[in-house]
C-alpha cells in the first residue's frame, strides 16, 4: 500500500491506497475502534482486484488527535473529501465494527457515491443488543493496544473465535498496531453516544452484505439479523469465527466480499428477493 498524508477540513489525515484494477469500482475501507491502517493489511492483501482506500481516523494511528470531538457524520464527510482528492466518485464501502457505523452513515449521507455496502461485525448503534457487561468494560480502555500481557489476557474475551485458543494471533496482531493516544480512542467512543441508524436503515437502497462472526462477544449475531431485517436489499453471512474474522479468516472473508462486489445485477436481485418473514432467519 502507498501511504501518504493530507490536510482535510483542518485535520491532518494519514491515508493509504492499494492500487488495483481500473475496471473495478474502488473500495473504501472504514476501520474499527483504535485500529490503524496496518491492521487491515491481511484482508486488503487477500482482495484480488479492487483499488482500496483506507485512512486513520483523527486520533488513531498516524492521524493527530483533534482538538474537538466529532460525530460519525464528520468522519463520513471527511471520507468523502478524501475520495474527492483521489478522484474517486462512486465507491463500494466496507465498514468493520466502529467503522461499520461510519459506513452506514456514509451510505445515508453520500448515497449517490455508495454503489454497494458491506457491514462487518457491526451494529445499528444505540438500539442494539450489546455484549456482556464484562466484555464492554474491557473495551472501554485501549490498554490491549499498548500492554501485550494484558492483550493476551483479554483477547479471547473481547474478540472470541480463534483468539480464544490461539495466543500467537495476539502477537501477530500487535505487530501491526500503531497506537496514537488514549484521547483519540475515547473520542471514537464518544462519537457513538446517542447515534443510531435504526430510524433510517430501511431507506438504504444499496445492495448490502452483512457479515458477522458466530462467536462475537462484542457484537452478538442478533444485531446482524436485525440489520438484515431492516435493510431492504441485504443478505447475511455468518462466519465460524469471532469479531475479527476479517483478520483471522482473511482469505475466506475476502472471497465472500469479492463475490458480492462482482455479482451481476440480475443475480443480486434474485438473491435479495426473499419473503419478509425470512429476513430474521
Regions found by a protein language model. Name each.
Residues 11-62:
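Conserved HGGG/HGGXW glycine-rich cap/lid loop of the alpha/beta-hydrolase fold
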Residues 54-94:
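Active-site loop/oxyanion-hole signature of alpha/beta-hydrolase fold enzymes
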Residues 95, 99, 103:
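Gly/Ala-rich beta-loop-alpha elbow adjacent to hydrolase catalytic centers
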Residues 104, 108, 114-144:
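Flexible "cap/lid" loop of the alpha/beta hydrolase fold
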Residues 128, 148-200:
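Conserved alpha/beta-hydrolase catalytic His-Asp/Glu region
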Residues 204, 210-212, 216:
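Short beta-strand/loop motif that positions the catalytic acidic residue
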Residues 217-223:
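Conserved alpha/beta-hydrolase "acid-adjacent" motif
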Residues 241-254:
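Catalytic histidine-centered segment of alpha/beta-hydrolase-like enzymes
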Amino acid at each position: 500500500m502507498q501511504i501518504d498524508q493530507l490536510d482535510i477540513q483542518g485535520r491532518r489525515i494519514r491515508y493509504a491506497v492499494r492500487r488495483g484494477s481500473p475496471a473495478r469500482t474502488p473500495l473504501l475501507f472504514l476501520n474499527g475502534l483504535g485500529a490503524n491502517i496496518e491492521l487491515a493489511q491481511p484482508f486488503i492483501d487477500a482482495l484480488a482486484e479492487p483499488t482500496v482506500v483506507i485512512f486513520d481516523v483523527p486520533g488513531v494511528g498516524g492521524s493527530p488527535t483533534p482538538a474537538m470531538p466529532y460525530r460519525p457524520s464528520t468522519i463520513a464527510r471527511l471520507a468523502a473529501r478524501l475520495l474527492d482528492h483521489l478522484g474517486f466518485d462512486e465507491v463500494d464501502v466496507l465498514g468493520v465494527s466502529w467503522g461499520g457505523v461510519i459506513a452506514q452513515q456514509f451510505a445515508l449521507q453520500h448515497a449517490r457515491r455508495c454503489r454497494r455496502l458491506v457491514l462487518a461485525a457491526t451494529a445499528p448503534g444505540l438500539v442494539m443488543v450489546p455484549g456482556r457487561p464484562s466484555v464492554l468494560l474491557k473495551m472501554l480502555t485501549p490498554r490491549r493496544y499498548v500492554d501485550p500481557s494484558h492483550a493476551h489476557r483479554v483477547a479471547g474475551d473481547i474478540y472470541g473465535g480463534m483468539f480464544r485458543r490461539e495466543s500467537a494471533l495476539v502477537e501477530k496482531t500487535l505487530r501491526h498496531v500503531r497506537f496514537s493516544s488514549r484521547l483519540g480512542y475515547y473520542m471514537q467512543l464518544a462519537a457513538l453516544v446517542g447515534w443510531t441508524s435504526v430510524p433510517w436503515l430501511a431507506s438504504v437502497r444499496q445492495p448490502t452484505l452483512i457479515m458477522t462472526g458466530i462467536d462475537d462477544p462484542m457484537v452478538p449475531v442478533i444485531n446482524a439479523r436485525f440489520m438484515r431485517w431492516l435493510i431492504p436489499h441485504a443478505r447475511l453471512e455468518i462466519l465460524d469465527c469471532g469479531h475479527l474474522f476479517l483478520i483471522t479468516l482473511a482469505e475466506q472473508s475476502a472471497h465472500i466480499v469479492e463475490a458480492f462486489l462482482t455479482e451481476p445485477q440480475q443475480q443480486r436481485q434474485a438473491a435479495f428477493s426473499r419473503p419478509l418473514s425470512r429476513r430474521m432467519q
